[in-house]
Amino acid sequence: MEQVIQFEDVVKIYPLKAGDVTALNHISFSVERGEFISIMGPSGSGKSTLLALMGCLDTPTSGSISMSGRAIRNMSDEELTSFRRDKIGFIFQYFNLFPLLNIIENVSFPQMLRGGVNEEKAREVLRAVQLDERLFTHTPLELSGGQQQRVAVARALINDPDILLCDEPTGNLDSKTGASIMELMTELNRKGATIIVVTHDPGVAKYTNRTIRIVDGCIAS
C-alpha cells in the first residue's frame, strides 16, 4: 500500500521563557492511502501538534516527515503552501465558515485560492455530503450545526485532497448529529478517502479502523 504520511523519529519542542516544552517526543508512524485513523489522548498530550505537523502547518524540531513520498524538509515555503492547499482537506470543530458568504461561495473558497471557481463542482460535493439543495444559497447562520459541518466537509473535499484531517469534527454537535457526520466520514472512506480524526471521544474513534494513542508526547499504542 502507498504511504501518504510517514513520521520518522519526530520531535517537536516549543521554546518558552519558563523552559522548553517537548510536545512530541520521538514519534514514528505511517498512514497508508485509504486508512481511517483516530488520534486520541488527553488534553495537552500532543494531538494538536501532531495534526499541525501532518497538515504542513508547522515543521518538526528534528526527525523526518514525508507526505505522499516527499520529505517536507525539502519543500520550499511555496511548495508547502501548494501541497497544503491542493492535497490536504481540513475539517474543524467550529466549522470556520464565512458568515457573509452563501454556502456555494463558502465551499468554493479553496478554489478561489487556486485562481478559479467551478460552481458545479461545489454543487457536486454538497450533494455528496447530502445537503439539501434548497440551502445552497443560504448563509451559514441560517443552517443548523450539523448542516454547517456538512458544508465544512464539502469545502474540504472541493480540491479532491489526498488526505482529510479532522480536528474534533463532532465536538460542537449533539450526539445524534455527530453520529450522522461520522457516518458521512465512513462513507467517504469507503469511497477511498484517507481520513485522520483527532478526538477525545471513544464514540467517534469506534468509526475508525485504527487508533493512535498519544500520551505525554509519545505514542502509547
Across the structure, where does each feature detected by a protein language model lie?
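Hydrophobic anchor residue at the start of the ABC signature
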Residues: 153
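Conserved ABC transporter NBD signature motif
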Residues: 63-71
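Catalytic Walker B motif of ABC-type/P-loop ATPase nucleotide-binding domains
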Residues: 164-167
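Conserved catalytic motifs of ABC-family nucleotide-binding domains
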Residues: 160
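Short coil-to-helix segment of the ABC ATPase nucleotide-binding domain corresponding to the Q-loop/switch region
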Residues: 101-108
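Conserved ABC ATPase "signature" region
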Residues: 70-71, 117-134
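Conserved ABC ATPase signature
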Residues: 139-143, 147-149
